[in-house]
């Protein structure tokens, strides 16, 4: 039997050293005992594998009728979302024979050459756009790109796929950033794995020294953090 998607993804995060344990200051100012570092996906093999996980999650949600079957382009917000969008569309083609465009934004408008604020598949009225991003902390990137997309064309944003849902409440409410974005914009948000799934899987996965990746000490620190900040 094939291992669950979240378990395989957790192993990938750990082996890529993208999931780190220690003490980290987040954008929110919170001190977290764990951190997801998307910068660790720094070579062709890792980013290709990451794209495969995104594609598998997308296909899973389409099959469950949670996500529109027609996706015209995958949009990744600059900068970290750019390789995600490209890798995801390549994986969708290779694994599922689905030819989908990719689009990303420029941080600054270009006034020469092809110009404009967008790169990749041009946005047109009625297109179904799927957003991809790495880890959502407060939803700031989404709130910035949605108006940008709508300013280009009357597109339908059909959803957002993340690598990890940290499942933390925002500063302003008891909702998580994911729940807050879903409520505000009305499109579904999916994650390849959430933090609870990751820690549950990490307790079972054995590292190179014969010990679980997630020790009792790490699990306790994560549990205490989520007791305080979890949504």
UniProtKB/Swiss-Prot annotation:
CC cofactor: Mg(2+)
Keywords (A to Z) from UniProt: Glycosyltransferase, Magnesium, Pyrimidine biosynthesis, Transferase
Stored InterPro entries: OPRT, Or_phspho_trans_dom, PRibTrfase_dom, PRTase-like
EC number(s) per entry: 2.4.2.10
Residues bound to 5-phospho-alpha-D-ribose 1-diphosphate: 27, 79-80, 106-107, 110, 112, 133-141
Keyword Disulfide bond (UniProt): no
Protein function: Catalyzes the transfer of a ribosyl phosphate group from 5-phosphoribose 1-diphosphate to orotate, leading to the formation of orotidine monophosphate (OMP).
Family recorded in the similarity comment: Belongs to the purine/pyrimidine phosphoribosyltransferase family. PyrE subfamily.
Protein name: Orotate phosphoribosyltransferase
Organism: Bifidobacterium animalis subsp. lactis (strain AD011)
């Amino acid at each position: 039997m094939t291992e669950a998607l979240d378990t395989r993804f957790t192993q990938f995060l750990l082996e890529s050293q993208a999931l780190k344990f220690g003490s980290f200051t987040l954008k929110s100012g919170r001190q977290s005992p764990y951190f997801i570092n998307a910068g660790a996906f720094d070579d062709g093999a890792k980013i290709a594998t990451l794209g495969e996980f995104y594609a598998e999650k997308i296909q899973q949600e389409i099959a469950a009728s949670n996500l529109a079957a027609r996706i015209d382009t995958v949009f990744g917000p600059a900068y970290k979302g750019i390789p995600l969008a490209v890798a995801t569309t390549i994986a969708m083609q290779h694994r599922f024979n689905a030819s989908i465009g990719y689009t990303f934004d420029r941080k600054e408008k270009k006034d020469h050459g092809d110009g404009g604020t967008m790169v990749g598949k041009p946005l047109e009225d009625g297109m179904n756009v799927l957003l991809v991003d790495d880890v959502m902390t407060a939803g700031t990137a989404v709130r910035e790109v949605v108006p940008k997309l709508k300013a280009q064309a009357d597109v339908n944003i059909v959803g957002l796929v993340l690598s990890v849902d940290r499942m933390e409440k925002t500063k302003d409410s008891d909702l998580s950033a994911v729940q807050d974005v879903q409520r505000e914009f009305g499109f579904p948000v999916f994650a390849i794995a959430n933090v609870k799934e990751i820690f549950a899987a990490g307790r079972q996965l054995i590292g190179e020294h014969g010990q679980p990746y997630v020790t009792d000490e790490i699990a306790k620190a994560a549990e205490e953090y989520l007791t305080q900040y979890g949504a």
